Regions:
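Active-site bordering "gate/hinge" segments
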Residues: 1-207
Length: 207
């Protein structure tokens, strides 16, 4: 299953055992725990402390983005971004807009008694634009996201900003000229420039 599951890690000395289960049911969890313990067994028995909740450390709201915007509202937002991008310049030929959201709930139980949960929303919006001029086609993308719901893209006109930025970059690419190529002198100072030289040609020469 790619929607739910549990992982177990057992550590004993320098040995570590891993096991997982696609089912969040007690028999499956006990079986995974036994498998991980058998892998890491080192001749000693560990003890399990009484569970206690970890302190509250909220970094972002525990929202479910999948339920906070209807399908019709999502389609309307995508259409707005398509319209915004095409309105920027007549050279825009194609607009590809995507909207994605994830809602994960994690529970971590440690043998020292720590019991911690994390509700993790994640949203992403991306706009790709293809522009054409005199038979030349160029494309560019812009987007953003964060651990919030889809309302994040409506704040401060963020989503429309992605569309405008994608168009701007595509138009810059239309006017871009090829970088000079061929042999040319390169002067490098001591220290970090050697790293640049290594990364630029060293790996290729080594292979």
């Amino acid at each position: 299953s790619i929607e739910q599951g549990a992982g177990v890690r057992a550590i004993s000395g320098d040995k570590t055992g891993f096991a997982y289960s696609d089912e969040i049911m007690m028999p499956a969890l006990l079986q995974a725990s036994s498998a991980a313990r058998a892998i890491a067994r080192h001749g000693n028995e560990g003890t399990l402390q009484a569970w206690h909740a970890s302190g509250d450390n909220t970094l972002y709201p525990a929202l479910d983005p999948l339920e906070r915007m209807t399908a019709a509202e999502k389609v309307a937002l995508l259409q707005q971004l398509d319209t915004e991008a095409r309105a920027q310049d007549a050279r825009v030929r194609e607009v590809i807009v995507s909207l994605a959201g994830v809602h994960e709930i994690m529970l971590v139980a440690v043998s020292d008694g720590t019991l911690a949960a994390d509700v993790r929303p994640l949203v992403r919006c991306n706009v790709t634009v293809i522009a054409e001029q005199d038979g030349r086609r160029e494309q560019a993308s812009s987007g953003g996201g964060g651990r919030s719901d889809y309302g994040f893209f409506l704040e401060e006109d963020r989503a429309r900003g992605y569309a405008r930025e994608a168009v701007r970059q595509a138009l810059v690419n239309l006017e871009a000229v090829a970088a000079p190529a061929g042999s040319m002198p390169v002067v490098l100072g001591p220290g970090w420039p050697g790293i640049l030289l290594h990364e630029a040609i060293g790996h290729g020469l080594r292979s």
